[in-house]
A protein has these predicted regions:
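General beta-strand structural signal in soluble alpha/beta enzymes
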Residues: 74, 97, 123-127
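A short helix->loop->beta-strand "cap" motif at the edges of active sites that frequently abuts
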Residues: 53-55, 91-94, 118-121
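Beta-loop-alpha module in the N-terminal Rossmann-like domain of NAD(P)-dependent dehydrogenases
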Residues: 59-90, 102-105
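Short active-site oxyanion
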Residues: 29-32, 70, 121-123
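Rossmann-fold NAD(P)-binding glycine/threonine-rich loop
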Residues: 86, 100-121
Length: 228
């Protein structure tokens, strides 16, 4: 059995824990969790214990890594990803990241790539809302590649961001046009998927992103266009 741990114990971590409980990950044991909010970590531990599975809440990242996990699921934040990736990889632990926006930083991306290679570990990028990364990689390998990412959101999904104003409730508008690297800086929790698609193809600086706000729209529409 492979040992699995989680950093960040919110909704996404709960989905992973549920998958373990339901037997959807038969080759993995969830052995530990870590969250800066202790009550959230305790909630997941309690869920696992209710189903007869041993799991502990760790007080620090160091305590979590001392469990010698094979895989660490990062479901916390880009800042957490930047903090944990290198220690985990050096520990012999591969990282499955949901905060893909952290990898838009080219220096950090190169550092984690080199550290993973040096330690026989890997960084796994969760595809999230968009699939087809194998197609993007294949097209990119052919050379002379250009790629665009289109995202449609409802105005309520943009509240709290620099582009939001009340006129978006009644007016359809393109609220952002630029690179994936620029997009993740402006929307650090909204467009992780653009960085994921760019890392599978042309890179964050070269992936062009357009975000449209549509009144009354709920959810997200994603479209990736790639040409070579």
């Amino acid at each position: 059995m492979k040992k699995l741990v989680i950093v960040g114990c919110g909704r996404l971590a709960g989905i992973v824990a549920d998958a373990v409980v339901k037997g959807l990950l038969p080759d993995y044991d969830l052995v530990g969790v870590y969250s800066r909010t202790a009550s959230k970590a305790a909630h997941i531990v309690h869920k696992m214990q209710q189903h007869g599975k041993h799991c502990i809440a760790c007080a620090t990242l160091e305590e979590l890594l001392a469990l010698k996990p094979d895989y660490l699921v990062e479901s916390a934040s880009p800042a957490a990803m930047r903090e944990l990736a290198l220690p985990a990889l050096r520990n012999g632990t591969s990282v499955i990241t949901l905060s893909i926006g952290a990898l838009a930083d080219e220096t950090f991306y190169q550092e984690v790539t080199e550290t993973a290679k040096a330690n026989g570990t890997r960084i796994y990028i969760a595809s999230g809302a968009t699939g087809g990364f194998d197609v993007l990689r294949t097209a990119s390998l052919m050379g002379n590649t250009t790629a665009r990412f289109f995202n449609e959101k409802g105005p309520n999904g943009l509240k709290g961001t620099p582009v939001y104003d009340d006129s978006l409730q009644t007016e359809q508008r393109t609220v952002f046009s630029g690179s994936a690297a620029e997009a993740i800086r402006l929307f650090p929790t909204k467009v992780n998927v653009t960085v994921a698609a760019s890392r599978a193809s042309v890179g964050p600086e070269n992936m062009q992103v357009s975000i449209q706000s549509t009144p009354g729209f709920v959810g997200d529409t994603q479209r990736v266009e790639i040409k070579n």
